Amino acid sequence: VFNHKHMEAKERFKVVYSAGAKEFLQRITSKAREKIISNARKASYTIDPKLFKKLTGTDLWEFRTLYDGKQYRLLAFWDKTKEVDTLVIASHGFIKKTDKTPIKEIERASKIMKEYFELK
C-alpha cells in the first residue's frame, strides 16, 4: 500500500520577488498571477523543466507558465550567499511572443542580477 502521508515534500529553494517582478505580477490578471505564483511554488519543490529551467549560455533561469494561451516568464537568478543557499530572485517578468527568450529580457535580468550583488 502506497502511503502519501510519509511523502513530505521538501522545499528545494526559496523564491524572492524583486520590485520589478512584483510590478509585473500586479499588471497582469489575478488568475494569471495566481497561476504564476502557484507554478513558482511548485517549482521550488519539484524538478520540472516545464516550470523552471536554465537559459542556455547564461546564469539565468526562467519560471515558465502557460496560461490562457500566453507564455508568461519570470527570469531569475540564484543567491547562494544566504543560509538557504538556494535562494532564487525573480528579477522581472514578461509575456513571450515566440519560442526564444528575447535578448533584451536576458540583458535586463543580467543587469538586475549585477546590481543586486553590488548592493550586498
Walk through the language-model features, giving the residues of each:
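Basic, Lys/Arg-enriched alpha-helical interface segments
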Residues: V1-Q71, K80-V88, I95-K120
